Amino acid sequence: MGSILSRRIAGVEDIDIQANSAYRYPPKSGNYFASHFFMGGEKFDTPHPEGYLFGENMDLNFLGSRPVQFPYVTPAPHEPVKTLRSLVNIRKDSLRLVRYKEDADSPTEDGEKPRVLYSLEFTFDADARVAITIYCQAVEELVNGVAVYSCKNPSLQSETVHYKRGVSQQFSLPSFKIDFSEWKDDELNFDLDRGVFPVVIQAVVDEGDVVEVTGHAHVLLAAFEKHVDGSFSVKPLKQKQIVDRVSYLLQEIYGIENKNNQETKPSDDENSDNSSECVVCLSDLRDTLILPCRHLCLCTSCADTLRYQANNCPICRLPFRALLQIRAVRKKPGALSPISFSPVLAQSVDHDEHSSSDSIPPGYEPISLLEALNGLRAVSPAIPSAPLYEEITYSGISDGLSQASCPLAGLDRIMESGLQKGKTQSKSPDSTLRSPSFPIHEEDEEKLSEDSDAPLPPSGVELVLRESSSPESFGTEEGDEPSLKQGSRVPSIDDVLQDGSPQHHGCSQPVPPADIYLPALGPESCSVGIEE
């Protein structure tokens, strides 16, 4: 990796390696890596010349056995790294074996059990038309930068199936079945010496003569496992992405995943790590990857501290060789779309203060990895956003012309004050309980003060809902009388609904202010419902 880049920077692009030699680790002679590597457009020296930064050294054997020339020009020091576009992806977690039994009518020898056959199924995503082929017991050869697989027996290769572009497409080919009774035990696993893969799933982009996507492919390498009961299962080994005739080995990052369905699925383990905060400070968002264990568990500040205090990963305790910060950026939008309030997204704004903006290209802004993975949560027009203050909206009492919504503010505070009898209550409305969507003007302040000075009938702690011709002059009050008098009649809910029904008011005349008193029976039995 580093040696190829260093040779290119020195101006030597031709690689003098014999055609019959192969790249295998450990090499028979020489070194696989140089004493430095390039990452993010910068050069770094490594104290471990033969150390692979992104995994185990044996993972290198899954790459191509022949070196290829790097097709890109070396970027400038301050130029952003080019992002490779993946047009097709096979979800390796969805790969499974489907078991088939031969029909009872099929001819079998006396005493012989019917054969058990298997086929492969999986889910994939494609941004272009693809052609998928399955190879069993196959070897890989690179021809002009394109991976070509060949089987020792033509019956071990499936037919090529063509698919259109789409997401979450299901691959199923019952016509291609695998008979493991004809396989040896050593053929179920990857043979490093011979370079034979038990199964290869190749998805090649099939867009005709489009030059931009020529040579794009996705390869899934897998092996088989035999269980005690005689059944078999498939185990994914590695994934490779071939872009512009260069093979890239895909490695997993532990600590970041798609969490669109995280809230809908209950967690089986309460102690499972489903958060996106740094495991050290538990406040900032994690954005730093530890290499070679690939644990994304640190924020920028804690990663800088860890460089000088320890050299072990806080998750697996293995020594690390490098720290890689992953920063997601997006183009600055012209007009911001409304998004619902999210503490995680709001926290990312504070997190940006810890990171420098020198490496951000002009015209872009940093966003959290959670935003980059799942996108912004757009507010649905049918579902309003959650209230930012103690505001509950009830629809019901109409002013005769239009249906007005009445905010019920400070409900929890009213119930708490109902338990403390005999305390003096302020008659002026609390400004902290006003809804931001209902501004109160000076004339409304005077009207509210006059309404608050009016004597209240004897009752317990009462919740007063005032209706007026304008929804802006709406307030809440609490009575401070100690208790109900004996023999006094508590208004029923039918009386409340009858007094508040719009049929008693004329549509041509303004509606005078009316008071509705609902007795509060305590926090355990307080239930308010007003509906037209």
From Swiss-Prot:
Gene3D superfamilies: Zinc/RING finger domain, C3HC4 (zinc finger)
Pathway involvement of the protein, from the record: Protein modification; protein ubiquitination
Entry EC number(s): 2.3.2.27
Composition skew (Polar residues), residue ranges: 422-435
Keyword flag Acyltransferase: no
Tissue spec: Widely expressed, with highest levels in brain, heart, kidney and liver. In the CNS, especially prominent in the Purkinje cells of the cerebellum. In the skin, expressed in the basal layer of the epidermis and hair follicles, primarily in the outer root sheath. Isoforms 1, 3, 4 and 5 are equally expressed in the liver. Isoforms 1, 3 and 4 are most abundant in brain, kidney and heart, respectively.
MF terms (GO), sorted A to Z: ubiquitin protein ligase activity; ubiquitin-protein transferase activity; zinc ion binding
GO terms classed as biological process: endosome to lysosome transport; heart development; negative regulation of adenylate cyclase-activating G protein-coupled receptor signaling pathway; negative regulation of smoothened signaling pathway; protein monoubiquitination; protein polyubiquitination; protein ubiquitination; protein-containing complex assembly
Region of interest: Disordered: 419-518
Modified residues (Phosphotyrosine): Y389
Keywords annotated in UniProt: Cell membrane, Cytoplasm, Endosome, Lipoprotein, Membrane, Metal-binding, Myristate, Nucleus, Phosphoprotein, Transferase, Ubl conjugation, Ubl conjugation pathway, Zinc, Zinc-finger
Cellular localization per UniProt: Early endosome
Catalytic activity, reaction form: S-ubiquitinyl-[E2 ubiquitin-conjugating enzyme]-L-cysteine + [acceptor protein]-L-lysine = [E2 ubiquitin-conjugating enzyme]-L-cysteine + N(6)-ubiquitinyl-[acceptor protein]-L-lysine
Pfam families documented for this protein: zf-C3HC4_3
Residue pairs linked by disulfide bridges in the UniProt entry: none
Motif (Required for TSG101-binding) on chain: 384-387
Residue positions where Phosphoserine is found in the record: S428, S449, S452, S501
Keyword Phosphoprotein: yes
Function per UniProt: E3 ubiquitin-protein ligase. Mediates TSG101 monoubiquitination at multiple sites. Plays a role in the regulation of endosome-to-lysosome trafficking. Impairs MC1R- and MC4R-signaling by competing with GNAS-binding to MCRs and inhibiting agonist-induced cAMP production. Does not inhibit ADRB2-signaling. Does not promote MC1R ubiquitination. Also acts as a negative regulator of hedgehog signaling.
Subunit structure: Interacts with MC1R and MC4R. Interacts with TSG101. Interacts with mislocalized cytosolically exposed PRNP; this interaction alters MGRN1 subcellular location and causes lysosomal enlargement.
Domain comment, as recorded: The RING finger is required for ubiquitin ligase activity.
Record-given protein name: E3 ubiquitin-protein ligase MGRN1
Source species taxonomy: Eukaryota, Metazoa, Chordata, Craniata, Vertebrata
